[in-house]
Amino acid sequence: MKKIIAIMLAACCLLSLAACGAKEADYKLGLGVELSTASSAENNAQVDATVAAVILDASGKIVQCRIDVAQNKMDVTGGAVDTAKTFKTKMELGSEYGMAGIIDNNGDGVMKEWNEQANAFEAYVVGKTAAEVKAIETQEANGHQIAVDEALLSAGCSMQITDFMAAVVKACEDKAAVAFKAGEGFKLGVAAISTAAESTAATADANGSANMYTDYGAAVVGADGKILAALNDATQPKIAISAAGVVEADFKATKRELGSEYGMAGIIDNNGDSVMKEWYEQSAAFSAFVVGKTAAEVAGLETQEVNAHHIAVDEDLLAAGCSMQITGLKAVVAQAANYAR
């Protein structure tokens, strides 16, 4: 009898421990983009977009952070454009980016590659709030605004961090952040996919445009490989060019930031249900739809061509109000899920 009681008590303890291990907590996923066209000059059109994804706990502190930069450049000499040009982000370039050993901003002899320095910053902001990230002190070194804190410098991040800070703060303060519950073992990924396909060359009569558009995605992936939360956004900066080079650059905000100003609502009824929502609403519907799916399942979402747009086939997604083209959305969210670490 004593043996049976002992076994039962042991079993209860194991069940209790398992229950504790499986306890879920409340989190939020936020996405932020800081974009500049300021480096465009003469025959070079350039867009620098820093994207950050953060997971916040219930107290607003960063639990995980991921950062990348889409630094897209195009030679526009003579007003020409390359619509087939492909782009890699700085994280994707890795050691190919070529920063290691170039500039010793803080004089310690340690000059790491861009991705290593970005990883150090990601780790540094864990446990901080948006206000604390915003308040990170910087100093000028070799024309760069680098950290003052020795903890960050000694971790190997001695490059300029102001765009990192801005993107992370935007992600923390994301008004469209999505809530989710999770236990242990989840990972976070961020991705950016760019195209120049809609660029136009300058002619003798009219300016052209170097349109380096980018889709951004963030995904939280559970231990089972399924998406727990996702977000996406997009930027469409337009850089006017002539035969003499860059004329002017125009960028206001991301599509999510523009909200109703983007002006998609009521324009195209792709699936004939008379529901024509704004871009940010359709984006949110897509993000909600992919929860519970794997990266492969998102990448494999079936599409159909309607009004020259590749829209969803799935009636649940269409009924949720997402009837716009989803090829860019599914590609970048799937990539973010694959990049989760």
Predicted regions and their residues:
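Long, contiguous C-terminal modules that act as interaction/assembly or targeting platforms
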Residues: 1, 21-23
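C-terminal motif of bacterial Sec signal peptides marking the signal peptidase cleavage site
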Residues: 16-19
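Positively charged n-region of N-terminal signal peptides that target proteins for export
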Residues: 1-11
